[in-house]
A protein has these predicted regions:
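Extracytoplasmic and endomembrane cell-envelope/extracellular-matrix remodeling and assembly machinery
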Residues: 1-179
Length: 179
């Protein structure tokens, strides 16, 4: 890819921290995964992790999914388990990684370990994988897509804020993205 060519150039890399390079390589690995180029996704994910360490969480994720899709289940498990244990990873991503680590362990016949990862995934109640994990564990899942009610005091408060009137005007003309 063009992005990878830019990163391969040492003159460009000298301006990046290791964390930034790891993040960029993680994005490239994810793009390779999205476009179904699993071998390159795995290779670039490994490179991202080697350079960016804990700043390459997307690399672990992309590498794990690409490895799973290409039937490299042990490798997928390494990526997902490492992501679960990664310091500073977002709760949603940890939940997702734990769910996929559960699938790897279940496929390998490790039921007890599978349940451990499923339990970790279920701890993030406000995520897709958390909801799926809770359902798989037999817990009641109450999903609601209702928007919270807005009280008149909130609307008055918002209107009094800098830019509040502009926001309401943009909403009235249907320009919700700019609002």
């Amino acid at each position: 890819t063009g992005a990878l060519d830019v990163l391969k150039n040492p003159d460009n890399r000298r301006y990046l921290t290791k964390a930034e390079e790891g993040q960029l390589r993680s994005e490239i690995a994810h793009a390779y995964f999205i476009f179904g180029v699993d071998a390159k996704a795995i290779r670039e994910a490994r490179h991202a992790i080697g350079v960016g360490k804990s700043d390459a969480s997307l690399g672990y994720w992309a590498g794990g999914l690409a490895a799973w899709r290409s039937a490299q289940y042990d490798l997928a498990g390494q990526f997902f388990r490492s992501l679960v244990d990664l310091p500073g990873v977002s709760p949603g991503r940890r939940s997702a990684a734990a769910f996929w680590a559960h699938r790897v362990e279940l496929r390998a016949g490790n039921a007890a370990k599978s349940i451990e990862y499923l339990t970790i995934a279920a701890q993030e109640i406000d995520s897709f994988y958390g909801a799926v994990a809770r359902e798989a564990l037999g817990q009641k899942v109450a999903l609601s897509f209702d928007l919270p009610l807005m009280h008149g005091r909130f609307i008055a408060w918002l209107a009094a804020r800098p830019g509040g009137q502009r926001m309401f005007g943009l909403l009235q003309i249907g320009n919700t993205h700019s609002a």
